[in-house]
Amino acid sequence: MDIQNIKETIAMIEEQNFDIRTITMGISLLDCIDADIDKTAEKIYQKIVNKAGKLVEVGNEIGHELGIKIVNKRVSVTPIAIIGAATAADDYTPLALAMDRAAKEIGIDFIGGYSALVQKGYQKGDEILIKSMPKALAATERVCASVNVGSTKSGINMTAVRDMGETIKIMSKGDKWLNAKLVVFANAVEDNPFMAGAFHGVGEADTIINVGVSGPGVVKRALEKVRGESFDILAETIKKTAFKITRIGQLVGQMASERLNVEFGIVDLSLAPTPAIGDSVARVLEEMGLETVGTHGTTAALAMLNDAVKKGGVMAAERVGGLSGAFIPVSEDEGMIAAVNSGALNIEKLEAMTCVCSVGLDMIAIPEETPASTIAAMIADEAAIGVINQKTTAVRIIPMGKEGEQIEFGGLFGVAPVMRVNKASSADFIARGGQIPAPIHSFKN
């Protein structure tokens, strides 16, 4: 093996904030379905504990052996709206409590899958789950929720969009963490390892391991060595760096899969930032030559970064999947926070950036007086970008405080500056309900 490659890998880990962001075990709950909600809850608890009981231990073991920090060990489950629909219950909070109890028992920080897939309409379980979401998330610490409101094949369920705007507004009256644990998707993927949007798709194996990597600091350091060079060299440098990052993710996933005796799923090629200095996607874009993220050229820089990461990573992994792109969460990226505070970055520019990356308007604080219809309209805009461009888009917004204030989350969630929102009304638009039809180019058969 090339000694230079070994040195570069050591530097990635020791100096450039490289880590494995998450090992996520996906668990099918289809065999937990029961007409009695209490029996269903107990089956859910038992299956999660039995399947993922050693997940944290194995993750720590692998991290210690390889000398790599594995930040999170997590679990995703089959969308609970499907599981709960077999019961006569009108509230699925007991199932969320079972998930939370299992998460605490096995020592993971988050469990995803309190979810509903409603891109083309509601089944009984979907409506019950969405109505119970504020109560379920308030009653639990580690449960994450998601709702898929649109897809390229189905269009956008605008009734669900309206309902999610109202749900987010209701939850904003509670703890700030409630909306940080809820993602509204279009074109949601079934093998996403990242929270809060992870759920285990019904087309997946009974139990799988998916891995999410993190490496903005590594990419930035590599780009520092090619300052002033052409975009051709820039793209090639990102590709080579992404290959190394993904290769480690592949190794960790294989080791976890073998030791847990679980099928290996995918490596998610996403670049996921943290609030730490030197671990920012925004700073990578600035290293390309932008004075600050948010200025003209930001969308082009992000498009190239996203594409080059995929091209480099896809050769390094057996199977890639998940969201696989650069994440641009505002509160979780110190460069994004700085750009918002300086006035260089606004919601409209972030929306443009979501056209070319993963995932969407992520961890953004907006004024608490923002009406539910405006929140729903923001979701509709993001869903439209995803549906028309055949990609995953999402919204995770926190209505809290006044414009200019800072909402402190701490840890990996960082600080969210409260951003300006257009005050003109979208209420009549959102009140229509119904379905925006699928785009013409969705008809592929």
From Swiss-Prot:
Bilayer-crossing regions: none
Pfam family, any one: DUF711
Superkingdom: Bacteria
Gene3D superfamilies: 3.20.70.20
Quaternary context: Homodimer.
NCBIfam families to which the protein is assigned, alphabetical: PRK05313.1
Family note: Belongs to the UPF0210 family.
Record protein name field: UPF0210 protein llmg_1581
